[in-house]
């Protein structure tokens, strides 16, 4: 008894058709490798694609800092924190949240949501919308993220002077937050909580 396979009946030499190869060619590179033009040729069809990597960088810039900030953080050390509490006249619950709470960052669409967990309560909820000034009383608050820095700046609407500024960055795996008002600056260093 012999067995025959369907595979034995295939004529491999005539069963495959040669498909025309598509070639990509880099035509132009200008402005210190920031702009490129690629040409795709397949048969008689030619397609050109222009790429401006500066536009891509602008769109992706916030991702680095925001991705790194996502998660839970606990205060590890600070400089001038008590003085900052006095300067800002923070209520005791806010002081406790800053000193002993777990700060939680998460993205929801294009917004960064932040709150602090303390004693089973969610405190100080904040939503950051990027590059959109928000009017508050006589001031405008705007948040901008680029590379490894996220800055929130409050300016007087009347004259554009800076009232206060908060800068956040990741350094050595820690979240470092600087709060500034005038010449006074407070530094907080947070460690990630697992």
Curated annotation (Swiss-Prot):
InterPro entries: Calycin (IPR012674). It comes from the Eukaryota. SUPFAM superfamilies: Lipocalins. This is Uncharacterized protein EEED8.3. It comes from Caenorhabditis elegans. Belongs to the calycin superfamily. Fatty-acid binding protein (FABP) family.
